[in-house]
Amino acid sequence: MDETVAEFIKRTILKIPMNELTTILKAWDFLSENQLQTVNFRQRKESVVQHLIHLCEEKRASISDAALLDIIYMQFHQHQKVWEVFQMSKGPGEDVDLFDMKQFKNSFKKILQRALKNVTVSFRETEENAVWIRIAWGTQYTKPNQYKPTYVVYYSQTPYAFTSSSMLRRNTPLLGQALTIASKHHQIVKMDLRSRYLDSLKAIVFKQYNQTFETHNSTTPLQERSLGLDINMDSRIIHENIVEKERVQRITQETFGDYPQPQLEFAQYKLETKFKSGLNGSILAEREEPLRCLIKFSSPHLLEALKSLAPAGIADAPLSPLLTCIPNKRMNYFKIRDK
């Protein structure tokens, strides 16, 4: 086994938490069950890694085997990357073709290898009619960098592909070309939608978030819940509070639905506007360049946070459509300009 392959496998195994190690190694299916039984997983991790590397050397693991292990690790730790969404489209009058996974993989790989002398492309199919693709980029003069790959998840017979954000922006056009041609589409555009949660992005673009996420029952009338109201409070005020809370709940449910929201961590709004003033000689009014403003909302679970604002009394209901339209618009990066 090549030293670079051994080092690659070693680094990948070291990233894997011990409580996930046997699960990931079994999913890798490179080492046999008998070989794994010879490993004492209760000893120090460094010793476990050395034993596993020795077993891989005995089986002469290749760079393809090591890349497959890395894909499996990333499938378990998708949230370590920020994922972007690309949408493809057919040309006018083009029919939907039958999808052939083998043909797709061969075509995708050939396009990249023709353009770049040094590139490693690996695939792993999943049960959801999806294929995970790992691309280690090189150049005409340098070998592929296995430690800064791009990951792509493509769902067959759909126009959507999800890619991990990469600092190698120069390769984005080539990646788009390979996806478009291999999937038999005509063109590709990057959507203004990003998140660390791949399943949530998938739910948004496929409009599955009101089906795939568990629903919860909140049909209990507000009168039957504890509103935290003082029992000595005027009955008219109590009634007014109940009516207002019911109104807020109704609007919130109409806006967000009665189910958990897809998980996004941020929404960004870029505003460009000309300053308008009725005063003559205003310095800002004479300014040719538009005023630019950037607003970013962030939260571990942004949509659920927005959903809770009005019921918590932090914001008035309904919220601004710019905040509530994120799932339907399928975007969390907005550019707002003067009409």
Curated annotation (Swiss-Prot):
Signal peptide: none annotated. This is Centromere protein N. It comes from Homo sapiens (Human). Coiled coil: none annotated. Belongs to the CENP-N/CHL4 family. Component of the CENPA-NAC (nucleosome-associated) complex, a complex that plays a central role in assembly of kinetochore proteins, mitotic progression and chromosome segregation. The CENPA-NAC complex recruits the CENPA-CAD (nucleosome distal) complex and may be involved in incorporation of newly synthesized CENPA into centromeres. CENPN is the first protein to bind specifically to CENPA nucleosomes and the direct binding of CENPA nucleosomes by CENPN is required for centromere assembly. Required for chromosome congression and efficiently align the chromosomes on a metaphase plate. The modification Phosphoserine is found at S226, S235, S282. Keywords: Centromere, Chromosome, Kinetochore, Nucleus, Phosphoprotein. InterPro entries: CENP-NAC/CAD_complex, Chl4/mis15/CENP-N. The gene is CENPN. It comes from the Eukaryota. Component of the CENPA-NAC complex, at least composed of CENPA, CENPC, CENPH, CENPM, CENPN, CENPT and CENPU. The CENPA-NAC complex interacts with the CENPA-CAD complex, composed of CENPI, CENPK, CENPL, CENPO, CENPP, CENPQ, CENPR and CENPS. Interacts directly with CENPA. Identified in a centromere complex containing histones H2A, H2B and H4, and at least CENPA, CENPB, CENPC, CENPT, CENPN, HJURP, SUPT16H, SSRP1 and RSF1. It is found in: Nucleus; Chromosome, Centromere, Kinetochore. One of its GO terms (cellular component) is cytosol. Changing R196A: Decreases the binding to centromeres. One of its GO terms (biological process) is chromosome segregation.
